[in-house]
Amino acid sequence: PTLSKNITVRKVKIINEGPNGDGCDPESCEDVLIEDCIFHTGDDCIAIKSGRNEDGRKWNIPSRNIIVRGCKMEDGHGGVVVGSEISGGVNNVFVENCEMDSPNLDRVLRIKTNNCRGGLTENIYMRNVKVGQCREAVLRINLCYEPKEAAKRGFNPTVRNVYMENVTCQKSRYGIL
């Protein structure tokens, strides 16, 4: 969904192993509930966005008040991802009571952005998440995503207030990267 409010995505099963095959991407949305869903994707299971570069800064509409709970995530580049198109900002994301497990799931929680995007990402909460295994990291914050992107630079992003509580992982290469 894009530019929407009061969204509920419940009991949806998404199987898409193709490239750029995200599961659910709320973009510049407010008051979103993603609940009891299953994601098996070739890209990000859930990717929260708010516009890319100049267009995102022009509209300046953040994604906010997003709850992800009771979901199962397999495969893909990230379980819950914020970005990379987050020029309008993202705030108040709550992830709880989810399960993730796959040797093909790269990351559990990922924030990706760069200085073409700018934007404020804040108040990201994850709790009570069980991870069997993931390939790379439980948490990855990448502030230099797509470093060769041909776009105007100088819009430094801000990421603050990222909290994780009772997130367990049996196997990953890194905890935080």
Label for each model-derived stretch:
Residues 1-177:
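Extracellular/periplasmic carbohydrate-active domains that bind, remodel
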